[in-house]
Structures are given as C-alpha cells and as structure tokens.
Swiss-Prot record:
GO terms for biological process: translation. Keywords: Ribonucleoprotein, Ribosomal protein, RNA-binding, rRNA-binding. This is Small ribosomal subunit protein uS17. GO terms for cellular component: cytosolic small ribosomal subunit. Coiled coil: none annotated. One of its GO terms (molecular function) is structural constituent of ribosome. Belongs to the universal ribosomal protein uS17 family. SUPFAM superfamilies: Nucleic acid-binding proteins. It comes from the Eukaryota. Pfam families: Ribosomal_S17, Ribosomal_S17_N. InterPro entries: NA-bd_OB-fold, Ribosomal_uS17, Ribosomal_uS17_arc/euk, Ribosomal_uS17_CS, Ribosomal_uS17_N. It comes from Anopheles gambiae.
Length: 153
C-alpha cells in the first residue's frame, strides 16, 4: 500500500473498505470490472497495485460513444499520451483527396506497460477527464516493422 502513496492525498479505490476485520489476504482488496464492448481487462489491472481513478478497468469511468484508433506520438505527460489520427479529406473542386491529421490527448492507465511511440492504440470515449482529455486507452498493439508515415490502419 505504501508504494501507491506518492502524492499528498491518501490513495485508495472507491468502494473498497480498508478497515475490514475478516479479509482473505490471498485475494486482496482490489476492485476491477470488465468494460464490455469486446475488450478484455488487462492482467495488470487485476493483479496490480496501482490506484488510478481515471482508469476504465479499476476506476469509475464508463466508456460510451466513439471507439477510435491512432498512433502514439508523445509520452511526456504523466498518465497522458498524445496520439495521431490520420485521415483523408476530399476536395470536390479537384476531385482528389488530401492527407490530414489530428492530435488527441488520451489518458493512459498504468495497467498498460511498455507503451512506446509508434504503437497503435485503440481508445474509447468517456466523460471529460480534463480540459483536453476525453478518451481512454483500451487496447495497445505493438508497432509493426517499417511503415510509411501516413497510413490508414
């Protein structure tokens, strides 16, 4: 429990009573749930010791709305990554497509380890978590070999 207490506020999961008398220590005090939509709960979310109230697997965040994919660009923020979504926009005058992209800030739960720039992530929409974050990482796929910069998954 001491390894999660790295900020001033006491870290604990909502709905877990830490003061119970008859606790089976084999199972431990950990709440996790399945988010549905065909996504599996990661092993680290079940057996880990991290506390993250914005995690869709161990926190009180529901995934509803859009499911998108993107490529990880930056990992410089704490528990937040920037992904790039490439798409084609049609120009009617020239009867051609042009390449465009959007960068999105996405919450990355600590249950996903070894995420690097270039990996493909699947994200799901949730309630606003901050000023710019409205999506949560649901699945991580390791990057393929050498790919072109602009690619439609």
């Amino acid at each position: 429990m001491a390894d999660q207490q790295n900020i001033r506020a006491f870290q604990k999961q909502l709905g877990i009573n830490l003061n119970r008398k008859n606790v089976s220590r084999k199972k431990g005090l950990r709440m996790h749930h399945s988010i549905g939509l065909g996504f599996k709960t990661p092993k680290e979310a079940i057996t880990g010791t991290y506390i993250d109230k914005k995690c869709p697997f161990t926190g009180h965040i529901s995934i509803r709305g859009r499911i998108l994919t993107g490529v990880v660009r930056k990992m410089k923020m704490h528990r937040t990554i920037v992904i790039r979504r490439d798409y084609l926009h049609f120009i009617r005058k020239y009867d051609r497509f042009e390449k465009r992209h959007r960068n999105m800030s996405v919450h990355l739960s600590p249950c996903f380890r070894d995420v690097e720039a270039g990996d493909i992530v699947t994200v799901g929409e949730c309630r606003p978590l901050s000023k710019t974050v409205r999506f949560n990482v649901l699945k991580v796929s390791k990057m393929a070999g050498s790919k072109k910069k602009f690619s439609k998954f």
